[in-house]
From Swiss-Prot:
Broad EC category: lyase
PROSITE patterns with a match to the protein in the record: RNASE_PANCREATIC
Cell compartments where the protein resides: Secreted
Organism this protein belongs to: Giraffa camelopardalis
UniProt-recorded name of the protein: Ribonuclease pancreatic
Keyword Lipid metabolism in annotation: no
A Gene Ontology biological process term: defense response to Gram-positive bacterium
Glycosylation, residue list: N34
Gene designation: RNASE1
Length: 124
């Protein structure tokens, strides 16, 4: 079974692209990362930084998660991210996404030993 850390990496890390030029990016990535297998995942964020840089956020600014848990961490610096949001005419299995690029601080939930990101909480 896929570990929580591996799942986070599959769903949220795309170090190979520093910026997204194609409006088709989300449609391609959401499919290739298996985020549209049994339903269209409504919202997903990809982070265009190295896995090591994203894992390092677990030792940065401790903040509360949206659900009230205290194991969330905000990155000290802004990171290059792409938000994928399902469009109104998207219908499974033909999931369709809007691609929006931004530079934002990311907030992730961390757990385990080693202490690594397991959930993408927000961007600020």
């Amino acid at each position: 079974k896929e570990s929580a850390a591996a799942k986070f990496e599959r769903q949220h890390i795309d170090s190979s692209t520093s910026s997204v030029s194609s409006s088709n990016y989300c449609n391609e990535m959401m499919t290739s990362r298996n985020l549209t297998q049994d339903r269209c995942k409504p919202v997903n964020t990809f982070v265009h930084e190295s896995l090591a840089d994203v894992q390092a956020v677990c030792s940065q600014k401790n903040v509360a998660c949206k659900n009230g848990q205290t194991n969330c961490y905000q990155s000290y610096s802004a990171m290059s991210i792409t938000d994928c949001r399902e469009t109104g005419n998207s219908k499974y299995p033909n999931c369709a996404y809007q691609t929006t690029q931004a530079e934002k601080h990311i907030i992730v939930a961390c757990e385990g030993n080693p202490y690594v990101p397991v959930h993408y909480d927000a961007s600020v």
